[in-house]
Design a protein with these regions (language model features):
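Alpha-helical transmembrane segments and their immediate juxtamembrane cytosolic regions
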Residues: 1-241
Length: 241
């Protein structure tokens, strides 16, 4: 039976897109004299601009995985997997096409910025990895799938400082962009895909528990407490790790 659509997922997706658009728009047009960190309004805007990318990545993993798991019928699952494979490849290709300088290409030159890795590349790769993890584990055990994606996300964030210190100079530049920002990439595969994996873990919880009577009040309160701790008192914990 088709499950009821969760409209708040659409709201999260819409919020992330709108925040991304306004963030780029204001950042591109705001004069330097108005970028005053002592102003409350600018601090608020900076904070929300800072969480836009994590929300966008988390929502992408949550939405894709929720749609994949909400119906266990084989025909539906295979359809979602095929669509996900297509979408993941499309996002990666589109990420490169958006960085392609047409005039330079007509002149027989491809600029280095063409190989920069951005949001679309990372989300596309995250979707492909989630599909692989589902086919490998989730098809047989949703619980096992949730453990794997949660563990992957946690490992990614735990070892990100060590990973950042690795030397990628011997790698082809086009590949190194996925792992380091030293050559100009804006987003890297690590740690950003970790947010998508946490989103996938949240999707499993939604699929399994969203029908429970007290799920949403408990989830909202729990996420509020977790978010407050992450914002104000998580630094010491991660430094300890």
């Amino acid at each position: 039976m088709e499950q009821k659509r969760l409209h708040f997922i659409d709201a999260i997706r819409a919020w992330a897109i709108l925040m991304m658009l306004q963030g780029h728009f204001i950042d591109g047009l705001l004069a330097p004299q108005f970028r005053d960190q002592d102003q409350d309004w600018f601090q608020i805007w900076t904070y929300f601009r800072g969480i836009t990318a994590p929300v966008f990545f988390t929502a992408s993993g949550l939405i894709f995985t929720y749609l994949l798991l909400k119906n266990t019928h084989t025909t539906y699952v295979n359809k979602r997997i095929k669509k996900g494979l297509k979408r993941g490849v499309q996002l990666i290709v589109l990420g490169y096409l958006l960085r392609l300088n047409l005039q330079g290409l007509l002149n027989g030159h491809i600029y280095p910025s063409f190989f920069y890795v951005d949001v679309l590349h990372c989300i596309g790769l995250a979707i492909l990895i989630l599909i692989f993890a589902y086919k490998l584990i989730g098809y047989w055990s949703i619980k096992g799938f949730s453990i794997v994606v949660f563990a992957l996300a946690t490992l990614i964030f735990s070892f990100e400082p060590w990973f950042k210190g690795l030397d990628w100079s011997n790698w082809p530049v086009a590949l190194s962009h996925y792992f380091t920002r030293e050559n100009g990439a804006l987003f890297t595969f690590i740690p950003w895909v970790g947010y998508s994996f946490y989103g996938a873990f949240m999707a499993v919880i939604l699929v399994k528990l969203s029908h429970k009577k007290m799920f949403y009040p408990i989830a909202i309160i729990g996420l509020f407490i977790l978010g407050t701790w992450l914002k104000y008192d998580s630094s010491r914990f991660f430094i300890f790790l």
